[in-house]
C-alpha cells in the first residue's frame, strides 16, 4: 500500500524563456528543475508553492496558474510523490541563489532536458502551451521511466 507525499512545483515563464534552478542538495541534486517542495501542515498547496518559490529563488508572484498534477512512483519506495505543478507568468524581485537552488534563465529552445528529470521533456511542451495535464510516471532509480501516462485535461 502506498502513502502519498504532497509536493509543489512552480515554473516561472517569460516570453521565449523559462527560469529553472540547479538543485544543489537533497532529492534531485545535480538536476535543473522548477521551484517547489513539500506542503507543510496548515498551509494550502498554493501557499506552499508561493513559499517554496520565495525560499528557493527570491521571487514572489501575484498569480499562480495550476497547470498540472503528476504522481511519481519510484520502484522500491512505498510513498508516491503527488506533485502539483503551477505556472507563473509574472513575478516580482530578481532571481537569487539560495542554499538549495541556483536559478538561471533558459531560452525555450535551449532547455537542458539532458540535465533534468526524464519526465520533463514529455510534459514541458504542454506547460509551455498553457495546457493542463494529469500524469503518472513510474521510475527505476532516478533516471529511467519504466511506465507512464500523460493526458491533457480541461480542468484540474
Curated annotation (Swiss-Prot):
It catalyses: 2-oxo-dATP + H2O = 2-oxo-dAMP + diphosphate + H(+); 2-oxo-ATP + H2O = 2-oxo-AMP + diphosphate + H(+); 8-oxo-dGTP + H2O = 8-oxo-dGMP + diphosphate + H(+); 8-oxo-dATP + H2O = 8-oxo-dAMP + diphosphate + H(+). This is Oxidized purine nucleoside triphosphate hydrolase. A motif (Nudix box) lies at residues 37-58. Its EC number is 3.6.1.56, 3.6.1.-. Keywords: Cytoplasm, Hydrolase, Magnesium, Metal-binding, Mitochondrion, Nucleus, RNA-binding, Transit peptide. It comes from Danio rerio. Residues 3-132 form the Nudix hydrolase domain. Oxidized purine nucleoside triphosphate hydrolase which is a prominent sanitizer of the oxidized nucleotide pool. Catalyzes the hydrolysis of 2-oxo-dATP (2-hydroxy-dATP) into 2-oxo-dAMP. Also has a significant hydrolase activity toward 2-oxo-ATP, 8-oxo-dGTP and 8-oxo-dATP. Through the hydrolysis of oxidized purine nucleoside triphosphates, prevents their incorporation into DNA and the subsequent transversions A:T to C:G and G:C to T:A. Also catalyzes the hydrolysis of methylated purine nucleoside triphosphate preventing their integration into DNA.
Amino acid at each position: 500500500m502506498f502513502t502519498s507525499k504532497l509536493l509543489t512545483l512552480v515554473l516561472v515563464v517569460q516570453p521565449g524563456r523559462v527560469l529553472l534552478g540547479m538543485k544543489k542538495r537533497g532529492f534531485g541534486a545535480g538536476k535543473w528543475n522548477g521551484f517547489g517542495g513539500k506542503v507543510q501542515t496548515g498551509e494550502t498547496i498554493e501557499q506552499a508553492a508561493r513559499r517554496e518559490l520565495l525560499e528557493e529563488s527570491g521571487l514572489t508572484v501575484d498569480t499562480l496558474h495550476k497547470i498540472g498534477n503528476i504522481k511519481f512512483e519510484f520502484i522500491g519506495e512505498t510513498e508516491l510523490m503527488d506533485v502539483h505543478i503551477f505556472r507563473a507568468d509574472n513575478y516580482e524581485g530578481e532571481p537569487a541563489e539560495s542554499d538549495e537552488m541556483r536559478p538561471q534563465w533558459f531560452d525555450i529552445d535551449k532547455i537542458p532536458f539532458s540535465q533534468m528529470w526524464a519526465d520533463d521533456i514529455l510534459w514541458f511542451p504542454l506547460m509551455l502551451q498553457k495546457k493542463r495535464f494529469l500524469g503518472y510516471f513510474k521510475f527505476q532509480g532516478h533516471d529511467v521511466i519504466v511506465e507512464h501516462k500523460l493526458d491533457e485535461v480541461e480542468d484540474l
